[in-house]
Swiss-Prot record:
Native source organism of the sequence: Dictyostelium discoideum
Biased composition (Basic and acidic residues): 96-107, 122-131, 139-158
Record's keyword annotation contains Coiled coil: yes
Biased composition (Basic residues): 83-95, 108-121
Start and end residues of each stretch annotated as Disordered: 76-158
Regions annotated as coiled coil: 72-168
Name by which UniProt lists this protein: Uncharacterized protein DDB_G0288629
Keywords for this protein: Coiled coil
Length: 263
């Protein structure tokens, strides 16, 4: 069998639980030692706490530094208010026209009914019955349309609310995720070759997770700000950012025993 016929075995990254368990800490403790970090402490727990503190700080500061939702300036606020007033005026005008049309129609009908009351009583009764039916059907259609509009609006609002809740749950787990080791692992120089494979996987995994949480925090901040402003389609505005956050969770490097030497 030639060398080219030998399949290249791929080494999957170690399964690292997001739970704060002894195995996870033990894995990272092998590489997070005082001589590998700039923190002036020899206590292992203090060292780990410092790593977690800086990881949390990076995530929190990212929301302020990289918010993609631009604040409304005075001109935009004025234009938004002007647009709302114009829409309100248009709606009032349409309502007034509708009421006037209904009144004119009623007056005309009353006049005709009075004139033909004596010899067209049966026809009038039939007309009244038809009008009543049409009015009832119109009310039903209006109610149905209103329910549909409210449902659509609620679904749009719910999508944003669901996204905010889901994103918060991702960030709530950050205190026990491998991202808390990233600030220390950034300073670790992993050995080259197969001997350093575990170290490089742990390092890349923790850094990718931290970058992901930074991204999710930016995403959450933008959704909340958008919702607080009362803007529409908040979820749709940041779909691309959501996709970026999902992609950031995956370490860029894929590992195999044969390419680890050139890593």
């Amino acid at each position: 069998m030639t060398e080219s016929e030998v399949s290249t075995p791929t080494v999957a990254p170690p399964v690292i639980s997001l739970a704060d368990n002894a195995d996870t800490i033990k894995l990272y403790s092998k590489y997070i030692v005082p001589e590998n970090t700039p923190f002036k402490t020899t206590d292992k727990q203090t060292l780990m706490d410092n790593c977690a503190f800086f990881a949390k700080m990076f995530v929190n500061l990212s929301a302020m530094a990289f918010s993609t939702l631009e604040p409304l300036d005075k001109k935009e606020t004025k234009e938004l208010s002007k647009k709302e007033k114009k829409q309100l005026k248009k709606e009032k005008k349409a309502l007034k026209k509708e009421n006037k049309g209904g009144k004119d129609k009623k007056d005309k009908k009353d006049k005709k009914d009075k004139k033909d009351k004596k010899d067209k009583k049966d026809k009038k009764d039939k007309g009244d019955k038809k009008d009543k039916k049409e009015k009832k059907e119109k009310k039903h259609d209006d109610d149905k349309s209103e329910v549909k509009e409210k449902k659509e609006k609620k679904e749009k609002e719910d999508r944003t609310i669901v996204e905010i809740r889901n994103t918060k749950s991702i960030l709530d787990a950050s205190s026990t995720s491998v991202s808390r080791f990233a600030p220390c692992m950034m300073f670790v120089n992993c050995p080259s070759g197969p001997a350093g494979l575990e170290c490089r996987i742990l390092k890349d995994t923790s850094i990718a997770k931290l970058k992901s949480e930074i991204c999710w925090n930016q995403y959450l901040t933008n959704l909340v700000q958008c919702q607080e402003r009362g803007l529409s389609k908040c979820f749709s505005k940041f779909v691309d950012l959501q996709k970026t956050c999902k992609q950031t969770e995956i370490p860029k490097k894929s590992f195999s025993l044969f390419d680890s030497l050139s890593y």
